[in-house]
A protein has these predicted regions:
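Acidic/glycine-rich phosphate/pyrophosphate-binding loops and surrounding catalytic core
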Residues: 1-76, 80, 92-97, 102-106, ...
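Short secondary-structure boundary segments
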Residues: 85, 109, 131
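Active-site loop ensemble at the mouth of alpha/beta enzyme cores that anchors a bound cofactor
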Residues: 142-145
Length: 145
Protein backbone atom coordinates (compact mmCIF):
# COMPACT_ATOMS: atom_id res chain seq x y z
CA UNK A 1 0.00 0.00 0.00
CA UNK A 2 0.93 3.60 -0.53
CA UNK A 3 3.78 2.91 -2.89
CA UNK A 4 4.19 4.15 -6.44
CA UNK A 5 2.55 1.76 -8.93
CA UNK A 6 5.21 -0.42 -10.53
CA UNK A 7 7.91 0.72 -8.11
CA UNK A 8 6.94 -1.09 -4.89
CA UNK A 9 9.92 -3.45 -4.88
CA UNK A 10 12.37 -0.61 -5.49
CA UNK A 11 10.79 1.64 -2.87
CA UNK A 12 10.78 -1.11 -0.27
CA UNK A 13 14.39 -1.92 -1.19
CA UNK A 14 15.27 1.75 -0.64
CA UNK A 15 13.68 1.60 2.82
CA UNK A 16 15.81 -1.46 3.67
CA UNK A 17 18.96 0.21 2.36
CA UNK A 18 18.18 3.19 4.59
CA UNK A 19 18.03 0.94 7.66
CA UNK A 20 14.29 0.24 7.75
CA UNK A 21 12.57 -3.12 7.48
CA UNK A 22 9.50 -4.38 5.67
CA UNK A 23 7.32 -6.87 7.49
CA UNK A 24 5.18 -7.44 4.41
CA UNK A 25 5.66 -6.86 0.71
CA UNK A 26 2.01 -7.08 -0.35
CA UNK A 27 -1.37 -7.80 1.16
CA UNK A 28 -1.01 -11.40 -0.05
CA UNK A 29 1.64 -12.01 2.62
CA UNK A 30 -1.12 -12.34 5.20
CA UNK A 31 -4.61 -11.18 6.07
CA UNK A 32 -5.03 -7.52 6.97
CA UNK A 33 -8.37 -6.92 8.67
CA UNK A 34 -9.34 -3.25 8.49
CA UNK A 35 -12.20 -1.22 9.96
CA UNK A 36 -14.52 -1.92 7.01
CA UNK A 37 -14.03 -5.67 7.42
CA UNK A 38 -14.81 -5.39 11.14
CA UNK A 39 -17.96 -3.38 10.40
CA UNK A 40 -19.10 -5.93 7.80
CA UNK A 41 -18.43 -8.88 10.13
CA UNK A 42 -20.05 -7.19 13.12
CA UNK A 43 -17.08 -7.35 15.49
CA UNK A 44 -13.32 -7.73 15.69
CA UNK A 45 -13.69 -11.29 16.95
CA UNK A 46 -16.07 -12.31 14.18
CA UNK A 47 -13.83 -10.84 11.48
CA UNK A 48 -10.83 -12.72 12.89
CA UNK A 49 -12.76 -15.99 13.23
CA UNK A 50 -13.92 -15.78 9.60
CA UNK A 51 -10.35 -15.35 8.36
CA UNK A 52 -9.12 -18.21 10.55
CA UNK A 53 -11.86 -20.47 9.19
CA UNK A 54 -11.33 -19.60 5.52
CA UNK A 55 -7.52 -19.33 5.59
CA UNK A 56 -6.16 -21.54 8.37
CA UNK A 57 -2.55 -20.84 9.27
CA UNK A 58 -2.33 -17.46 7.53
CA UNK A 59 -0.74 -14.60 9.47
CA UNK A 60 -3.48 -12.23 10.64
CA UNK A 61 -3.05 -8.52 11.31
CA UNK A 62 -6.02 -6.51 12.53
CA UNK A 63 -6.38 -2.73 12.59
CA UNK A 64 -7.85 -1.28 15.80
CA UNK A 65 -8.56 2.30 16.75
CA UNK A 66 -9.22 1.92 20.47
CA UNK A 67 -8.06 -0.13 23.43
CA UNK A 68 -11.27 -2.16 23.68
CA UNK A 69 -10.74 -3.41 20.13
CA UNK A 70 -7.12 -4.19 21.03
CA UNK A 71 -8.25 -6.36 23.95
CA UNK A 72 -10.72 -8.15 21.69
CA UNK A 73 -8.03 -8.79 19.06
CA UNK A 74 -5.61 -10.11 21.68
CA UNK A 75 -8.29 -12.42 23.07
CA UNK A 76 -8.99 -13.75 19.57
CA UNK A 77 -5.29 -14.52 19.08
CA UNK A 78 -3.99 -12.52 16.12
CA UNK A 79 -0.36 -12.24 15.06
CA UNK A 80 -0.15 -8.45 14.72
CA UNK A 81 -2.35 -5.58 15.86
CA UNK A 82 -2.10 -2.32 13.94
CA UNK A 83 -2.76 0.60 16.31
CA UNK A 84 -4.42 3.11 13.99
CA UNK A 85 -4.09 6.82 14.75
CA UNK A 86 -3.37 6.30 18.45
CA UNK A 87 -1.46 9.05 20.21
CA UNK A 88 1.62 8.38 22.34
CA UNK A 89 -0.33 7.89 25.58
CA UNK A 90 -2.80 5.48 23.95
CA UNK A 91 0.11 3.61 22.39
CA UNK A 92 1.85 3.28 25.76
CA UNK A 93 -1.40 1.92 27.22
CA UNK A 94 -1.69 -0.54 24.33
CA UNK A 95 1.85 -1.80 24.92
CA UNK A 96 1.04 -2.29 28.60
CA UNK A 97 -2.13 -4.23 27.77
CA UNK A 98 -0.30 -6.50 25.31
CA UNK A 99 2.91 -6.96 27.31
CA UNK A 100 2.25 -10.63 28.16
CA UNK A 101 1.05 -11.52 24.67
CA UNK A 102 2.94 -12.99 21.73
CA UNK A 103 1.05 -10.58 19.49
CA UNK A 104 3.19 -7.90 17.85
CA UNK A 105 2.05 -4.25 17.85
CA UNK A 106 2.40 -1.84 14.94
CA UNK A 107 1.81 1.92 15.19
CA UNK A 108 0.32 3.51 12.11
CA UNK A 109 -1.44 6.70 11.16
CA UNK A 110 -0.01 10.09 11.96
CA UNK A 111 3.55 8.81 12.18
CA UNK A 112 6.19 11.02 10.66
CA UNK A 113 9.96 10.92 10.64
CA UNK A 114 9.87 13.66 13.29
CA UNK A 115 7.81 11.66 15.82
CA UNK A 116 8.88 8.11 14.96
CA UNK A 117 11.43 7.93 17.81
CA UNK A 118 8.76 8.84 20.36
CA UNK A 119 6.50 6.05 19.10
CA UNK A 120 9.40 3.59 19.02
CA UNK A 121 10.14 4.42 22.66
CA UNK A 122 6.67 3.16 23.66
CA UNK A 123 7.75 -0.42 22.96
CA UNK A 124 5.75 -1.22 19.82
CA UNK A 125 7.36 -3.74 17.50
CA UNK A 126 6.76 -1.96 14.20
CA UNK A 127 6.29 1.60 12.99
CA UNK A 128 4.42 2.24 9.75
CA UNK A 129 5.84 5.51 8.48
CA UNK A 130 4.17 5.97 5.11
CA UNK A 131 6.23 9.07 4.38
CA UNK A 132 9.21 6.80 3.72
CA UNK A 133 7.58 5.79 0.45
CA UNK A 134 4.68 8.09 -0.42
CA UNK A 135 6.40 11.38 0.47
CA UNK A 136 10.03 10.71 -0.40
CA UNK A 137 11.65 13.65 -2.18
CA UNK A 138 12.27 13.20 -5.87
CA UNK A 139 15.68 13.37 -7.46
CA UNK A 140 15.81 16.05 -10.15
CA UNK A 141 17.84 14.59 -12.98
CA UNK A 142 17.99 15.36 -16.65
CA UNK A 143 19.37 13.85 -19.81
CA UNK A 144 20.65 16.95 -21.54
CA UNK A 145 22.61 16.45 -24.76
Amino acid sequence: RKTTPGLRELEKYAVRMGGGTNHRMTLTDGALIKDNHIAAAGSVTEAINRVKKEFPGVEIEVEVDNLEQLKEALQAGVDIVLLDNMNIEQTKAAVEIAKNSKTKLESSGGLKIENAAAYAATGVHYLAVGALTHSAPVLDIGLDF
